[in-house]
Amino acid sequence: MRSLIAMYQRIGLVPLIIIGLVLGVLIGWLAPNIGIALGLLGTLFVGALKAVAPILVFVLVMAAISQHRSGNEVYVKPVLIMYMFGTFLAALTAVGASFLFPTELVLVNAVIEPVPPANLKEVLTNLLMNLVANPVNAIAEANYIGILAWAIIIGFSLRQASDTARTVVGDFSDAISQVVKWVIALAPFGILGLVANTVAETGFAALAGYARILMVLVGCMLFIALVVNPLIILVKTGKNPYPLVFICLRESGITAFFTRSSAANIPINMNLARKLGLHEDTYSVTIPLGATINMAGAAITINVLTLAAAHTLGIEVTFASALLLSLVATISACGASGVAGGSLLLIPLAASLFSIPNDIAMQVVAIGFIIGVIQDSAETALNSSTDVLFTAAADPKYAR
């Protein structure tokens, strides 16, 4: 048994994930019933990540702040600036792609259970209410804005505590981090189950009718990941950005693509930041915060599908209205984590800028759910890998 574990560890996580991916595709295609059964592995893996992530963030941030000493610089502000700037550039990219490759949709009728926010004020109100949520509820409901707020407050108060108390908090943080490493080590089995179940249930046949809109969406996300983000990193660090970009895509993006959850990928990103030797006082804050507000993929989804609806209805989109849409999408995307249904349920809000009827907007949302197996996966991979990418770019190890 020990020899098997040693061999498993020796092969390395990324090769094992690739093996799990290939096996998942084959099993889901050749033996759908087995693929659906294996879906339990994926459900358990994602569940374990989601379970450990809130307590990891709470303890890690609390420990980092309580043990912080004056004179030790943190680099949160430049990361937040890159988050917002990157999201806005993603929104502009989506607008440009929608003009270059205008897409018309075949609208469908479907019942969407979650209620979309009525306006931007409601999105921002939800975000602020998350900030003052009960700390126990925040951890139980994975409300990362609330978790961060309480962890920061308690961390500051613990600075006045004894050295023994702060040591206990630090030791508890190390223990939680070890649990995360054990969960991450099971990623190949989780990916196997997720892929096998997805291929078995959908076979991707349902996506064929929406190939063009998918190409625009995924094309925008690839452009951000491989062109725009590297340019931001180049300007920030003055170094070749691609080694760091590919590390983040490989170590964070692949897992995020299959879990389809930025929250579940927080432990993965924390572990990667630690491997990269980044400043713990910084990444313990910016990575969970990024999972909440760094939403370049969400901005792309909102703009591409909104403009596709406008093109379908023959609505003229001016430069001014496109710029306004980009601003609204950037702000709305930052609140996407506080909206049931995420970025898709913010489409009616964006569509209202062009006086698109709500029933039409909800049909566009329905299309979003149909293509979600690809759209949501690519969106999460971009969002989550960018969290650790921008955090690394602001770190003294990489910064200019």
Curated annotation (Swiss-Prot):
Catalytic activity: L-serine(in) + Na(+)(in) = L-serine(out) + Na(+)(out); L-threonine(in) + Na(+)(in) = L-threonine(out) + Na(+)(out)
Subcellular location: Cell inner membrane
InterPro entries (alphabetical): Na-dicarboxylate_symporter (IPR001991), Na:dicarbo_symporter_sf (IPR036458), Ser_Thr_transp_SstT (IPR023025)
Pfam family, any one: SDF
GO molecular function: neutral L-amino acid:sodium symporter activity
Recorded topology in the membrane: Multi-pass membrane protein
One GO location term (cellular component): plasma membrane
TM helices/strands, residue ranges: 11-31, 45-65, 81-101, 138-158, 175-195, 213-233, 242-264, 295-315, 327-347, 354-374
Sorted UniProt keywords: Amino-acid transport, Cell inner membrane, Cell membrane, Membrane, Symport, Transmembrane, Transmembrane helix, Transport
UniProt keyword annotation of Cell membrane present: yes
Keyword Nucleus: no
GO BP term (any one): threonine transport
Recorded superkingdom: Bacteria
Alphabetized NCBIfam families for the sequence: PRK13628.1 (NF010151)
Functional description taken from the UniProt entry: Involved in the import of serine and threonine into the cell, with the concomitant import of sodium (symport system).
Family assignment from sequence similarity: Belongs to the dicarboxylate/amino acid:cation symporter (DAACS) (TC 2.A.23) family.
Name used for this protein in its record: Serine/threonine transporter SstT
Species: Psychrobacter arcticus (strain DSM 17307 / VKM B-2377 / 273-4)
